[in-house]
Each structure stands twice: as structure tokens, then as C-alpha cells.
Design a protein with these regions (language model features):
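Basic, flexible linker segments flanking DNA-binding modules
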Residues: 1-54
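Two-metal-ion RNase H-like nuclease active-site motif
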Residues: 59-69
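Mobile genetic element proteins and their domesticated derivatives, centered on retroelements
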Residues: 65, 80, 86, 105, ...
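Short conserved beta-strand segments at catalytic cores or DNA/RNA-binding microdomains
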Residues: 67-89
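Active-site beta-loop-alpha junctions of metal-dependent nucleic acid enzymes
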Residues: 70-73, 90-112
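RNase H-like two-metal-ion nuclease catalytic core shared by retroviral integrases
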Residues: 121-123, 129-135, 144-168, 177-187
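C-terminal domain-tail junction helix/linker
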Residues: 133, 171-214
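Short, structured coil segments at secondary-structure junctions
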Residues: 139-140
């Protein structure tokens, strides 16, 4: 009975993700020179990521990526995939600006902060601003890791899930045309598909069980 209630609450939580997170200490992007920026990224290299994250032996470590609209539209979707359970969340962002990306991060953290210990992302401009780094590490106290350039396989879980999302919203789809609710309904369908890697359980079921055990 408790599991059923939690599943319903989780579905409601996902469907009702707001377009902005709860208010946090306001941060501003600080200008950094290219060399300093390079060092900020290199010191957070995926090669420094602990083995317990690499081998998926612990819960709460997420891969994130951007799923883009056409070039004439700034809106895009940031996807979050928990590595151990393959559970996926998507949040719309108005643009790739540091402020709009931070708003999307705040939205995600407003629901999943307690089950997020680290984030691994690529080196796209939306994820390498000083505001993004300070938001993840200073505001929320999470570890941040960057994959190597041109290495999508280092975030293979996220890439595979994004391909499934693209079957619903093909390349070139303009995400300004959908609501956050419609996006999450599509992602919920993905989360309810049994996975061989999860012994034919669904990401939603495995994720929910982990939350209950926390």
C-alpha cells in the first residue's frame, strides 16, 4: 500500500514540476579568463570521479545533458538520468543562458535534491559557466564532474535515454510547443518500460524502492 501511494506521489511530483525552483541565495556569473575556466573544468574531470560512482554501486549520481530545439528556437530540455536506476527527469529551459540553466537546475533540485549526490555533464557552454558550477557546488553542495570533449560514451546512460526521448520528440522539434507536463508525461512512459539491465524491472519501480529505503 505504501509503495502504491509513493508511486502516485512520484508521478504527481514529476507532472507538476514548476518552471522555476525554490528561491535560493542569488548568484551571479563571474567573468573568468579562458585559462581559469579550463582549470575549473579540468579539476572536475570525470577521471577524478570515484569508482563507486563509475561502477554504479551507489545511488544518487546523475548524468545530465541538453536536448536541443532547432537553431531558430532558444528553448531546450535538460535531461537528468540517475545512473543506478536509469530513472529520467526532464526540465524545460527557456534558453542556454546561465540564468535560465540555473533556473532549470533549481527546478530539478526542488524535487530531487535529497537524492542527488553528484552530477556528470559534458562541456557544453550551458554547463561550463561559473554560475552553473557555483550553483551545483556552493548552493546545493553536490559534486560536479565533466566528461572529456567529444566523449558521449562517458555519459552513455544519458545518451541512450535521450535517444528514446527523441523518438517522441524528433530532432528539429521545437520544445516551445509543449508544456512541462506534456514533456514529463512522455518521460514517465520511458520510466515505465522494463529494462534488461534492471532485471526487467522499470526505472520508476527501482527508483521508488530506493527512495523508500533512504
Amino acid at each position: 500500500m505504501q509503495s502504491t501511494i509513493l508511486n502516485r506521489n512520484l508521478s504527481a511530483t514529476l507532472n507538476d514540476l514548476p518552471l522555476k525552483g525554490k528561491r535560493r541565495r542569488h548568484l551571479r556569473a563571474k567573468p573568468v579568463n579562458p585559462e581559469h575556466k579550463r582549470m575549473m573544468i579540468e579539476t572536475r574531470s570525470i577521471h577524478n570521479r570515484p569508482e563507486v560512482i563509475n561502477n554504479r554501486s551507489t545511488f544518487g549520481h546523475w548524468e545530465i545533458d541538453g536536448v536541443m530545439s532547432p537553431q531558430d528556437s532558444q528553448s531546450f530540455v535538460i535531461t537528468f538520468v540517475e545512473r543506478k536506476t536509469r530513472f529520467m527527469v526532464g526540465v524545460k529551459a527557456k534558453s542556454k543562458s546561465s540564468d535560465d540553466v540555473k533556473t532549470a537546475i533549481d527546478t530539478f533540485m526542488s524535487r530531487f535534491e535529497n537524492v542527488c549526490d553528484s552530477i556528470t555533464c559534458d562541456r557544453g557552454t550551458e554547463f561550463t559557466s561559473s554560475l552553473f558550477i557555483y550553483s551545483i557546488e556552493d548552493t546545493y553542495g553536490k559534486k560536479l564532474y565533466y566528461a572529456d570533449p567529444q566523449s558521449p560514451g562517458q555519459r552513455g546512460t544519458n545518451e541512450r535515454m535521450n535517444r528514446e526521448l527523441r523518438r517522441v520528440f524528433p530532432a528539429g522539434y521545437d520544445f516551445t510547443k509543449i508544456t512541462q507536463r506534456k514533456l514529463q508525461n512522455a518521460i514517465q512512459d520511458i520510466n515505465e518500460r522494463p529494462r534488461n539491465v534492471l532485471r526487467f524491472k522499470t526505472p520508476e519501480k527501482v527508483f521508488t524502492k530506493r527512495i523508500m529505503a533512504a
